[in-house]
């Protein structure tokens, strides 16, 4: 019943603060995520190693999320900030996917040369290898905030759970599945 006690949102546009639902001073970022480029596991004959490779002869097809899903929005933002979005689109190299799992499936099956996904998804996929992280500053940070709800039926338990989320045990688990944990 933690969800009746705390609020955790991946989408920063969902601002429960304005709805006056969270206890003041309890909001914090649990973890952050990265955007990475992946290739089929054990198969990278063209030596793809950089996001910029997408507009070179190294890449025939790249899987990206549709523009209506977060991973697609981050991919577009990255390529726009690299000054390569228009060029990439004009080269007809993009295989669009409806979600990050579909991007992973296309890459793992070898249907595309590479794809753009979250590090957490890459870390839990057996079918891909990470070859690059998105260049620093090429997209807005991906953070997952949490806060204790004002109407928590058991605020002490909620506080204990939040303390657990901030602790070293949780940090190990989060790191193992590809999340970055904010430093204190």
Identify the meaning behind each predicted range.
Residues 1-184:
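Exported/periplasmic ABC-transporter solute-binding proteins
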